[in-house]
Amino acid sequence: MPVIDETPMTYTEACRYFPGGVNSPIRACIPVGIVPPIVSSASRDVFIDSFGKNFIDFCGSWGSLIHGHSHPKILDALCSAASQGTSYGLTSENEISLATTLFSCLGLQDHKLRFVSSGTEAAMTSVRLACGVTQRSVMIKFLGCYHGHADVLLKGMTIDENNLMEVPHLVDRYFSSDPCLPLTLILPYNDLKTFEEVMEKIGERVACVIFEPIAINMGVVLPEAGWIESIITTCRRYGALSIMDEVVTGFRMGSRGMRSILDVTPDITVYGKILGGGMPVAAVLAHQSIMEHLMPVGTVFQAGTLSGNPIAMAAGQASIELCQERDFYPKLENLTEGFLSPIEDFIRCKGFPIALVRAGSMFSFFFRETPPRNLRDVQECDQKTFGIFYRHAFSRGVYLSPASMEASFISSVHSRENLAYTQNVLIDSLVKTFEGI
């Protein structure tokens, strides 16, 4: 009889096989100074590590799990789809079903989409598509916004004065005539004046402007009034395409996302996370006049062996159907409000220098007096003190997203019991952090 090794798998063992012990860098939890847990299993709002310790999960696979871990409807869909084949390399019924559900949910006509396997892939495809449609090669993004790890999109994630290029320098020396090689220009987030000045000078050379309607990867940083609307309007004025990255906000901020909340119509929208129900699914969506520039109809290349994977499509179908259930978002809003309001009141009462910023069921603790409006503000936060606060909470089984520049998330299945426990833990952790008790 074989001997079964029941020794818990550890982070040290993971480091033997993976750089930094992880397959995505933030999972190493370096910003908060903890040894990252190795997950054994997860259900609803809790995961269990390899030592058998329970953690209440407020990361939720970085916002993907709005329905929590191991939702029965999603698991049933996965098992049923897997029994019919794991991958076809052909268009499947599941792809058509999910697309039908999406267009019905979003209330869109005359649009088409392309399924891919990650937010990075979707954002990368959207930029390539915009360059092909416009035959231009300058892309604008905003400092601190994250759109995946493609080379042209990864710039501008930290403050670097050399990245904030002078416009004449850009035009005279760096403009490329090859639409397949976009040049990235990085501008400050929430700075409409600078954006409009740049567009006035080079707008006719800009292929696209990509933006998050709510910045998530520097923590939850809210757009100022009129910011998103002005981006889209200005793009139209100069013939550039606007790309709204709803990888995180899509189906998190309501069934129709930020395009409905803000009443805007970007040229291209990118979805992911919740769209896959925990499986690798993302999508690029636009009016058919734009989407038909993609091969095989047009000339802009995009391909993927696992794009539209039938198992992932089934999980996505179940996830979106759950989002469409009656009162799903009002209930989630009430759950989040009831959880965060007492913590916010406590912070205000004690006068702690913390801005607790919330958007829907997403939230961030910024260790500064006022909510940040851009990356520079975020980087002025007290990261060291945040780490102390985080470690106090983590030691008592509360797992927030492990960096001050990341959002945490509430799921629809967070129990009131676990939320009440977490309230007490977070309040106690704040007291220990600031008063040394």
Swiss-Prot record:
Acetylation found in the keyword field: no
Organism per entry: Chlamydia caviae (strain ATCC VR-813 / DSM 19441 / 03DC25 / GPIC)
Cofactor: pyridoxal 5'-phosphate
PTM-bearing positions, type N6-(pyridoxal phosphate)lysine: 273
Gene Ontology molecular function, alphabetical: glutamate-1-semialdehyde 2,1-aminomutase activity; pyridoxal phosphate binding; transaminase activity
Enzyme Commission (EC) number: 5.4.3.8
Major location category of this protein: cytoplasm
Name of this chain's protein: Glutamate-1-semialdehyde 2,1-aminomutase
